[in-house]
Amino acid sequence: MEDEIRAFCQTAADCFIRLGDCAPAIAEAAGVVTASLRAGGKVMFCGNGGSAADAQHLAAELEGRYLKERAPLPGMALTTNTSTLTAVGNDYGFDHIFSRQVSAHGRPGDVLVALSTSGNSANVLKAIEAAREKGVSVIGLTGAGGGKMAEVCDLCIRVPSTQTPQIQQMHIAVGHLLCGLVEDALCS
């Protein structure tokens, strides 16, 4: 059992070392988010399962604080309103639970951060489509392959793993990096 624990930790450590290769894309994403917030835009987040939890976590880091005492920043998780999710899911289908919200709330200059370990989640892809129609910039967080999202995002950060647990660990790390870089830019 201890060997399994050590192997898990070593795999995670190796993934995080390789995540450094994503530094240019992460820095670019932080610039996009910072510019949007400076111009009065907002950041919307979406994803399924563990990615939904990450979406909520990262929106909370913006609305509350990450590391610095500052004014709240407009972050919005599209995963939280159960009435909207179930009404849209029932009336239009699960594939539209995020896209309807992007269509309702998205404005030119806003940012959608779309999370999918595979890059192929149908409802996330529909949200990206809606974002593009509204003039919303799209930052994708996926696994190494990128899936269909790699082709449709303005910027796709493909973390260096094909295993869901490691992808999710790195997604939250990327999110924390984004929050920290944005705070540094806006609070300096």
Swiss-Prot record:
Coiled coil: none annotated. GO terms for cellular component: cytoplasm. InterPro entries: GmhA/DiaA, Phosphoheptose_Isoase, SIS_dom, SIS_dom_sf, SIS_GmhA/DiaA_subfam. The keyword Transmembrane does not apply. Its cofactor is Zn(2+). Substrate binds at residues 48-50, 61, 90-91, 116-118, 121, 168. Pfam families: SIS_2. Binds 1 zinc ion per subunit. One of its GO terms (biological process) is D-glycero-D-manno-heptose 7-phosphate biosynthetic process. The reaction produces a racemic mixture of D-glycero-alpha-D-manno-heptose 7-phosphate and D-glycero-beta-D-manno-heptose 7-phosphate. This is Phosphoheptose isomerase. It comes from Rhodospirillum rubrum (strain ATCC 11170 / ATH 1.1.1 / DSM 467 / LMG 4362 / NCIMB 8255 / S1).
